[in-house]
Amino acid sequence: TAWPPTSLIMTQALRVLNQLLAPEIASGKVKIRIIEGMTFERRVELGESLPADVLAACKECNVLIKGPFTTPRAGDKFPDGTPMPNMVSANSLLRRSLDLFAAVRPIKIPEKNIDWCFFRENIEGEYIWGNKGIQVNDDLAIDFKVQTRQGSERIARAAFEYARKNGKHNVTAITKANIVKLADGNFLKAVHHIGETEYPD
Protein backbone atom coordinates (compact mmCIF):
# COMPACT_ATOMS: atom_id res chain seq x y z
CA THR A 1 0.00 0.00 0.00
CA ALA A 2 1.00 3.63 -0.23
CA TRP A 3 1.70 5.57 2.94
CA PRO A 4 -0.20 7.41 4.22
CA PRO A 5 -2.89 5.02 2.99
CA THR A 6 -5.20 6.46 0.36
CA SER A 7 -7.64 3.57 0.61
CA LEU A 8 -10.45 3.85 3.14
CA ILE A 9 -10.21 0.09 3.58
CA MET A 10 -6.57 0.18 4.66
CA THR A 11 -7.05 3.28 6.81
CA GLN A 12 -9.79 1.55 8.78
CA ALA A 13 -7.91 -1.77 8.88
CA LEU A 14 -4.90 -0.07 10.44
CA ARG A 15 -7.10 1.78 12.92
CA VAL A 16 -8.77 -1.46 14.03
CA LEU A 17 -5.44 -3.31 14.23
CA ASN A 18 -3.90 -0.62 16.38
CA GLN A 19 -6.87 -0.81 18.75
CA LEU A 20 -7.13 -4.60 18.93
CA LEU A 21 -3.40 -5.21 19.24
CA ALA A 22 -2.51 -2.20 21.38
CA PRO A 23 -0.97 -4.25 24.26
CA GLU A 24 1.02 -6.48 21.87
CA ILE A 25 2.24 -3.48 19.89
CA ALA A 26 3.21 -1.60 23.06
CA SER A 27 5.18 -4.60 24.37
CA GLY A 28 6.95 -5.11 21.05
CA LYS A 29 5.45 -8.57 20.59
CA VAL A 30 3.71 -7.42 17.41
CA LYS A 31 5.04 -4.95 14.89
CA ILE A 32 2.90 -3.47 12.14
CA ARG A 33 4.95 -2.94 9.02
CA ILE A 34 3.85 -0.82 6.09
CA ILE A 35 5.04 -2.21 2.76
CA GLU A 36 5.22 0.50 0.13
CA GLY A 37 5.95 0.37 -3.57
CA MET A 38 2.69 -0.83 -5.11
CA THR A 39 1.49 2.36 -6.74
CA PHE A 40 0.43 1.73 -10.31
CA GLU A 41 2.80 4.40 -11.58
CA ARG A 42 5.80 2.68 -9.98
CA ARG A 43 4.82 -0.72 -11.32
CA VAL A 44 4.46 0.67 -14.83
CA GLU A 45 7.85 2.39 -14.53
CA LEU A 46 9.51 -0.85 -13.38
CA GLY A 47 7.59 -3.00 -15.84
CA GLU A 48 6.63 -5.33 -12.97
CA SER A 49 3.10 -6.04 -11.78
CA LEU A 50 4.52 -7.19 -8.44
CA PRO A 51 7.93 -5.59 -7.82
CA ALA A 52 10.57 -7.96 -6.44
CA ASP A 53 11.27 -5.78 -3.40
CA VAL A 54 7.59 -5.77 -2.45
CA LEU A 55 7.31 -9.55 -2.76
CA ALA A 56 10.48 -10.02 -0.69
CA ALA A 57 9.06 -7.77 2.04
CA CYS A 58 5.78 -9.70 2.01
CA LYS A 59 7.64 -12.98 2.49
CA GLU A 60 9.31 -11.57 5.63
CA CYS A 61 5.93 -11.10 7.36
CA ASN A 62 3.89 -13.62 9.31
CA VAL A 63 0.51 -12.08 8.43
CA LEU A 64 -0.46 -9.90 5.48
CA ILE A 65 -3.38 -7.50 5.24
CA LYS A 66 -3.58 -6.40 1.63
CA GLY A 67 -5.31 -3.32 0.33
CA PRO A 68 -6.73 -3.00 -3.18
CA PHE A 69 -4.30 -3.33 -6.09
CA THR A 70 -5.07 -1.69 -9.42
CA THR A 71 -4.73 -3.84 -12.53
CA PRO A 72 -5.68 -2.17 -15.80
CA ARG A 73 -8.43 -3.76 -17.84
CA ALA A 74 -7.89 -4.45 -21.50
CA GLY A 75 -8.29 -1.16 -23.35
CA ASP A 76 -7.74 1.13 -20.33
CA LYS A 77 -5.86 4.34 -21.02
CA PHE A 78 -3.91 6.92 -19.06
CA PRO A 79 -5.48 10.40 -18.74
CA ASP A 80 -3.42 11.58 -21.72
CA GLY A 81 -4.94 8.85 -23.90
CA THR A 82 -1.88 6.59 -23.91
CA PRO A 83 -2.85 2.89 -23.71
CA MET A 84 -2.02 1.23 -20.39
CA PRO A 85 0.30 -1.78 -20.58
CA ASN A 86 -1.06 -5.32 -20.58
CA MET A 87 0.03 -6.26 -17.06
CA VAL A 88 -0.49 -9.48 -15.15
CA SER A 89 -2.78 -9.05 -12.15
CA ALA A 90 -0.69 -8.24 -9.07
CA ASN A 91 -3.25 -10.13 -7.00
CA SER A 92 -2.75 -13.27 -9.09
CA LEU A 93 1.03 -12.99 -8.88
CA LEU A 94 0.91 -12.56 -5.10
CA ARG A 95 -1.35 -15.59 -4.75
CA ARG A 96 0.94 -17.75 -6.87
CA SER A 97 4.14 -16.51 -5.24
CA LEU A 98 2.81 -17.24 -1.74
CA ASP A 99 0.86 -20.35 -2.80
CA LEU A 100 -2.44 -18.88 -1.60
CA PHE A 101 -4.44 -21.49 -3.46
CA ALA A 102 -7.72 -21.20 -1.53
CA ALA A 103 -10.00 -18.19 -1.33
CA VAL A 104 -12.15 -19.01 1.70
CA ARG A 105 -15.40 -17.04 2.00
CA PRO A 106 -17.68 -17.87 4.96
CA ILE A 107 -21.27 -16.59 4.87
CA LYS A 108 -23.60 -16.78 7.87
CA ILE A 109 -27.17 -15.45 7.91
CA PRO A 110 -28.79 -17.21 10.89
CA GLU A 111 -32.29 -15.84 10.30
CA LYS A 112 -32.24 -17.45 6.84
CA ASN A 113 -30.58 -20.65 8.06
CA ILE A 114 -27.55 -19.93 5.89
CA ASP A 115 -24.18 -21.16 7.15
CA TRP A 116 -21.99 -21.68 4.11
CA CYS A 117 -18.30 -21.53 3.38
CA PHE A 118 -17.05 -21.15 -0.18
CA PHE A 119 -13.65 -22.51 -1.23
CA ARG A 120 -12.56 -21.07 -4.58
CA GLU A 121 -9.43 -22.30 -6.35
CA ASN A 122 -7.31 -19.17 -6.40
CA ILE A 123 -4.29 -19.97 -8.56
CA GLU A 124 -5.33 -22.17 -11.46
CA GLY A 125 -8.29 -21.95 -13.81
CA GLU A 126 -8.58 -18.58 -15.54
CA TYR A 127 -6.17 -16.98 -13.08
CA ILE A 128 -3.01 -18.69 -14.23
CA TRP A 129 -2.65 -17.10 -17.68
CA GLY A 130 -5.06 -14.19 -17.56
CA ASN A 131 -2.98 -11.98 -19.84
CA LYS A 132 -1.56 -14.67 -22.13
CA GLY A 133 -4.45 -14.99 -24.53
CA ILE A 134 -4.21 -14.83 -28.29
CA GLN A 135 -5.78 -12.06 -30.34
CA VAL A 136 -6.23 -13.97 -33.58
CA ASN A 137 -7.75 -11.00 -35.40
CA ASP A 138 -10.11 -8.12 -34.67
CA ASP A 139 -13.03 -10.53 -34.45
CA LEU A 140 -11.51 -13.44 -32.54
CA ALA A 141 -9.72 -13.76 -29.20
CA ILE A 142 -8.72 -16.92 -27.35
CA ASP A 143 -7.97 -17.16 -23.62
CA PHE A 144 -6.83 -20.11 -21.55
CA LYS A 145 -8.10 -22.08 -18.58
CA VAL A 146 -5.62 -24.42 -16.90
CA GLN A 147 -6.63 -27.03 -14.33
CA THR A 148 -4.33 -29.69 -12.87
CA ARG A 149 -5.32 -32.79 -10.96
CA GLN A 150 -3.01 -31.78 -8.10
CA GLY A 151 -4.54 -28.32 -7.83
CA SER A 152 -8.06 -29.70 -8.03
CA GLU A 153 -7.42 -32.31 -5.35
CA ARG A 154 -5.77 -29.77 -3.06
CA ILE A 155 -8.70 -27.34 -3.05
CA ALA A 156 -11.14 -30.24 -2.69
CA ARG A 157 -9.20 -31.60 0.27
CA ALA A 158 -9.19 -28.18 1.95
CA ALA A 159 -12.97 -27.91 1.60
CA PHE A 160 -13.63 -31.45 2.84
CA GLU A 161 -11.26 -30.95 5.77
CA TYR A 162 -13.07 -27.76 6.76
CA ALA A 163 -16.41 -29.55 6.54
CA ARG A 164 -15.21 -32.42 8.72
CA LYS A 165 -13.72 -30.13 11.37
CA ASN A 166 -16.88 -28.03 11.51
CA GLY A 167 -19.40 -30.85 11.64
CA LYS A 168 -20.76 -30.33 8.14
CA HIS A 169 -21.80 -33.26 5.97
CA ASN A 170 -22.50 -31.66 2.60
CA VAL A 171 -19.86 -30.44 0.17
CA THR A 172 -21.01 -29.14 -3.21
CA ALA A 173 -18.73 -28.67 -6.23
CA ILE A 174 -19.81 -25.84 -8.52
CA THR A 175 -18.47 -26.03 -12.07
CA LYS A 176 -19.39 -25.58 -15.72
CA ALA A 177 -18.47 -29.19 -16.45
CA ASN A 178 -21.55 -29.47 -18.66
CA ILE A 179 -19.89 -26.97 -21.03
CA VAL A 180 -16.16 -26.94 -20.16
CA LYS A 181 -15.78 -30.68 -20.51
CA LEU A 182 -12.06 -31.13 -19.91
CA ALA A 183 -10.88 -28.57 -17.34
CA ASP A 184 -14.08 -28.44 -15.28
CA GLY A 185 -14.84 -32.09 -15.97
CA ASN A 186 -11.48 -33.17 -14.58
CA PHE A 187 -11.94 -30.82 -11.61
CA LEU A 188 -15.26 -32.47 -10.82
CA LYS A 189 -13.72 -35.95 -11.09
CA ALA A 190 -10.96 -34.91 -8.68
CA VAL A 191 -13.48 -33.59 -6.14
CA HIS A 192 -15.50 -36.81 -6.29
CA HIS A 193 -12.33 -38.89 -5.94
CA ILE A 194 -11.17 -37.04 -2.83
CA GLY A 195 -14.62 -37.16 -1.28
CA GLU A 196 -15.13 -40.86 -1.91
CA THR A 197 -11.65 -42.06 -0.94
CA GLU A 198 -10.65 -39.71 1.89
CA TYR A 199 -13.86 -38.18 3.29
CA PRO A 200 -16.65 -40.75 2.93
CA ASP A 201 -18.48 -39.16 5.88
Annotate each predicted stretch with a short phrase:
Residues 42-142:
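N-terminal glycine-rich phosphate/adenylate-binding segment common to multiple enzyme folds
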